Amino acid sequence: MMDCRDASACQGVGSLCFFPYLNPLVSWHALVLGHLLYLFVVFVMRSIMRGRRALNMSRVLVVYNVLQICLSAAMAINLSPPLKNGVFNLSGKFCPDIEFWMFVHYCSKYIDMLDTVFILCKKKEDQLSFLHVYHHCTIGLIWGILLRNGLANGTAFFGTWINSSVHFLMYSHYLWTSLGYRNPFKFLLTKIQMLQFSLCILHAILVTLLDTQFTLGWNLLQLLYNASLLVLFLNFYMNSRGKGCAIEKKPQ
C-alpha cells in the first residue's frame, strides 16, 4: 500500500484524509437529507402501493442481485489486504486504498436502500420490519460520519470487509432463489449475520483495549450499534424459528 500514514495525520482534520474532494458526499447535508429522503420514499411508496397490485420484479431483481454480488465481491477482495496484519489490523496504518473502498462501501449503502423499494413494489409488507428500516436508515449515516472525520481507515476496515463478505453470500442466495432454486444452506445465513455483529462487538472491545488510534467514543458507537443489530436479529431469528427458517430484509 502506497502513501500510508500514521493515524494522527488523518484524525481531527474534519475531512477524508486522502480524498478530500469527496467531502461533499459525506457532508451533514448529504447524510441527513439522504436518510430522511429514504424514510420519505418509504412513507410515500406505502401509500401509493396500498391501492395497487404488486409489481412483477423478477427480472429486475435478477439483474440487481447480480450487480450486488459483483459489487460486494469487489469490496471484499479490495479490503482484504489488511488481513495479513491480523484479522482486525489493530493499530494499522491509514492508507488511501482502504479509505477509497470504505467510501465505495458507504455509497453502496444508498444502493442497498433499493431493497426497500423492491419490497414495497412487491407489497411484501411482512418484510418491512422495524429491523429492516432501522438498519437502512442508520448504517450509511454511521459510515459517513467516520469518513467525514478521517477515521474510515486502519482497523476500521474490518467492519466494511466483513459486511461486504456477508452481503456477497446474502445476494448470492437471493439470486439463486430468484431463479427458482432452493438453497439448502438458507438456515445458516441469519446465523452468519449474527456472527458478523458479534465479531464487530469483539472488534470494538479489542480496539478499546489494544488500539490507540480511536477514542472511546468511537468504540462505544461501534459496540452499541452492533449490539443493537445483534439484539434485533436475534429477536427476528427466535420469532422466525417457529415459522421455518427466514432471512431478514432482502427481497427475492
UniProtKB/Swiss-Prot annotation:
Pathway annotation from the record: Lipid metabolism; fatty acid biosynthesis
BP GO annotations: fatty acid elongation, monounsaturated fatty acid; fatty acid elongation, polyunsaturated fatty acid; fatty acid elongation, saturated fatty acid; long-chain fatty acid biosynthetic process; sphingolipid biosynthetic process; very long-chain fatty acid biosynthetic process
EC number: 2.3.1.-
GO molecular function terms attached to this record: fatty acid elongase activity
Bilayer topology annotation: Multi-pass membrane protein
Active site: 135
Region forming the signal peptide: none
Subcellular location: Membrane
Glycosylation sites: 56, 89
Record GO cellular component, one term: endoplasmic reticulum membrane
Disruption phenotype: Genetic disruption in bloodstream form parasites reduces elongation of arachidonoyl-CoA.
Catalyzed reaction equations: (5Z,8Z,11Z,14Z)-eicosatetraenoyl-CoA + malonyl-CoA + H(+) = (7Z,10Z,13Z,16Z)-3-oxodocosatetraenoyl-CoA + CO2 + CoA
InterPro entries per record: ELO_CS (IPR030457), ELO_fam (IPR002076)
Transmembrane stretches, start-end: 25-45, 60-80, 100-120, 127-147, 150-170, 187-207, 214-234
UniProt name for this protein: Fatty acid elongase 4
Record organism: Trypanosoma brucei brucei (strain 927/4 GUTat10.1)
Origin organism lineage: Eukaryota, Discoba, Euglenozoa, Kinetoplastea, Metakinetoplastina
Underlying gene: ELO4
